[in-house]
Design a protein with these regions (language model features):
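Conserved short beta-strand edge segments in small beta-sheet-based binding/regulatory domains
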Residues: 67-78
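A short, polar/proline- and glycine-enriched secondary-structure boundary/capping micro-motif
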Residues: 16, 58, 69-71
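Short S/T/G/P-rich N-terminal loop/turn motif that feeds into the first structured element of a domain
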Residues: 1-34, 38-44, 52-56, 76-95
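Short, flexible helix/strand-to-coil boundary loops that buttress conserved ligand/catalytic motifs
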Residues: 61
Length: 95
C-alpha cells in the first residue's frame, strides 16, 4: 500500500534536516521511501511511502513527532484509479 504523507515542520525545516543529516530517514525495514517534494518556503513536505504493514509507518512517524505533524492519506496510482473508478465511456468524453 502507498501513502501520501503530508508533513508540517512544527519548528521549521532546520531541525528536521539536522536530524536527517545525523540519523538518516530512520525508516524501519519494510517501509519504503518512494519520493517527495517540499514547499518552496520549507514548511511542508509531501512524501510517498510504501509498506504492507501500517504499523511500520506509525513507528517511523513516532520517531519524528517532536518535529513534524503528520497527515496520512492512503493513495493509489492514477492508472489504478482509472481502472477502478472509470465507467464505460467516461474517459473518452461519452455520456
Amino acid at each position: 500500500m502507498q501513502y501520501m504523507i503530508i508533513e508540517t515542520f512544527t519548528h521549521g525545516a532546520e531541525p528536521v534536516y539536522a536530524r536527517f543529516r545525523e540519523r538518516g530517514r530512520m525508516a524501519p525495514e519494510g517501509l519504503e521511501y518512494v519520493s517527495s517534494v517540499v514547499t518552496s518556503d520549507g514548511r511542508q513536505c509531501f512524501q510517498i511511502m510504501a509498506c504492507e504493514d501500517r504499523s511500520l509507518l506509525d513507528n517511523w512517524m513516532a520517531a519524528w513527532r517532536d518535529l513534524v505533524a503528520f497527515e496520512v492519506i492512503p493513495v493509489i496510482s492514477s492508472a489504478e484509479a482509472a481502472l477502478r473508478f472509470a465507467t464505460p465511456g467516461s474517459l473518452s468524453g461519452d455520456s
